[in-house]
Amino acid sequence: MNTTPRTRREFLGQVGQGTLIATLGGGLASELGLTRAVADDAPDRLDFGALEPLVGLMQDTPVDQLLPRLVDQLHSGTALRDLVAAGALANARTFGGEDYVGFHTIMAHAPAYHMAMEMPAGLEALPVFKVLYRNTNRIHEHGGRKSEVLHPVQPLAVTEGRVGGELLQEAMRRKDMNAAEQTFAALAAGPPEDAFNHLLYAVQDHTDVHRVVLPYRAWDLLGLIGKEQAHTLLRQSVRYCVKAESWSGAASYGEPRQLLPKLLEEHQLLGRAPGGRKAEDVWVDQFSQTLFKSTPSQAAAAAAAALAEGMAPADIGEAITLAANQLILRDMGRRPQEEVAGKPPGSVHGDSIGVHACDSANAWRNMARAGNTRNCFASLILGAYQVAQDRIERGGDFLNWEPLPVAYHVKGLRSTGPASLLKEAEEAIRGNLQAHAAAVIHRYGELGHDPKEAFALMRRYAVSEDGALHAEKFYRTVTEEFNSTRVAFRWRHLTALARVTASEFGRPAAGMAEAWELLKA
C-alpha cells in the first residue's frame, strides 16, 4: 500500500479494529464512536513519500507554468518515469476514479510513457507532457487539493473461509462504499497480484467500457511506477464500481452478473487449467465473425464452449479483438444528432463505439493474461459478451455495412513504394479522408512494408492532436494488438488506426506547441 509506511504491529492493530467494527456492524460501530475513533487516529491525507514533492508539483502548479517546470525537472535529472508516476498519483488522489476527464487522463499515463519510448531522441517527453498538461489542468478545474477524493482507509478484516473478491463484490452490490474500500484495503495488504484478482470480481459485474479499461490501464501503469502503488491505483476501480450501482440504468446490469457464473459452472471451467490447443488462421477468423454476428449471451456462450474445448486463451482473445476492430472499419460515423465540439458528424475518434470496443477488448484480453485461471476464463467470456453488445448498443446496421478499405479506394491507388504510400497516407490524414487513409495503410501492409514507419506516422498525430481523451490510449491499444495478432490479420488494426487518425486531425492538443518549443530549445 502507498500510504505512510506502517509496521507489522500497526497493520495488525488496524485489522483488529476493523474486525471489531465488522463484528458489531457498521451502524452500531458508528453509534459507539468506533469508526470515528479509528478515523481520528489515521492521517487525513495520502502521502507518497519520496514522490510527494513531485505529486504536489502536479497538483499545485498553475497549468500555464507547468511545462517549463517539467522541463526543469528533466534537466535536473528527474526521470520521465517519475514524472509519469507523480502525475498518476496526483490524479488518483484528486479524482479517485470518479471524474470523467480525470479517469480518462489516468488511463492515458501508461500509453503516453510507452509512446515516449518510441519517440525520436530529444522528443521523448512530448506524449508524457501532453497527458500531464491535461492532468494538471483538470485537477485545477476540479478544485485542487481541497477536493481530493482518496484518503487513507482502514482495512476491514476479511472473513476466514470466504473469497475476498466475493466479499468485495457483495459490498459493491450493497452500494456500501466504506465497506468496499475497507475490504479492498485489507486485500491490498497482500501481493498486488492477489489484490488485482480480487478486484476483478467487482469489475466483472458489468461490461461498461470505463469499468473494464480502468483496472487494466492501472495494472499496466503499476509495471512502470511500481507495484507498491497498487492499492492507490486499483481502489479507483472499487469506487467506480460502487458508484455505478446507483446510476440510472443500473438495473440492466443484471445479465453479465447472472450469465458469468452460470457459464463457468455449465462448462466446468472452475478449477481447471486453460487449454493449449492452438487455432489455425481460419478458426480465428471464423470465430471472430461468430462473435460479431451473435447476441451478447450467444457470444459469451461461444467463448465458454471454446475454453471448455481447450482452445488457447490467446487465440480466443485474438478473435475478440478482431471482432471489435470491425466496429471501426464498418462504422458510418457519428450521426448529426450525436455531434459535439471536436467530434463532428461522420467522425469515429474519441468515444466512438469502435474505439470503445477496441479498448475494451484489449483490456479483457490483457486481464485474461494477467489474472488467475478463473479470471482468465471470466475475462474472455465477458470480452466476447461485450463485443457483441457493442455491435448493437448504439444502433446501426453493422452486419451489412461494408468494412474499410472499400474496393473503390484500393483500386484508385497507384503508389507502391513505402515513402510514396506514407506521403499519400499523411495527405489523407490531413484532409480528414478516413476511407482513403485506411486504404493506403491497408495497401502499405499488403505490400509487406515496414510497420514501424507506419506507426511513426500515426504516433506523430496521436501526440499532436487532441484526440478527445482517447488518442494515446487507442494508439497503445493498436500497438499491443498489432504485436500480438498473427500476420494474416494484424494490419486490420493499423488500418483502423489510420481511419481514426484521419478523423481526429485538425484539433491540436492543448500545450503541445509550447512543449515542442521547450524541448527543441
How would you describe each model-predicted region?
Residues N2-A521:
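Mature, well-folded catalytic/scaffold domains that follow N-terminal targeting or propeptide regions
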